[in-house]
């Protein structure tokens, strides 16, 4: 049923729960592909070249660490696992990947690392739910 699963993560606790759920789904559904995507907002250009490069390097290192942890949580699945690190607004990046990779399902946490912790549904999750062309599973 869900051969192409897209997991959007950001390193939050909710994303960790979504990662476990996506791994379980991929195993149970015998999915062909689980694609794990992490996207971060662009580094502001006003930082200047040396500071900008340092900020980009720090974000890339953090993203790689988050992806490594996600791969451990997912564990062994019957299909392939692909990872992508993207720069740009997270919801837009997830929607773009879902469309271009023809995802059957998007899995993501209900809230991320944003400052509005009291919200029931995070702004990025809400945007994905509103604009996705495939089913979206939001995990708490």
Question: Where are the regions that the model predicts?
Answer:
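Structural beta-alpha unit
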Residues: 24, 72-106
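Glycine-rich, Arg-bearing micro-motifs that act as flexible, cationic patches
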Residues: 108-130
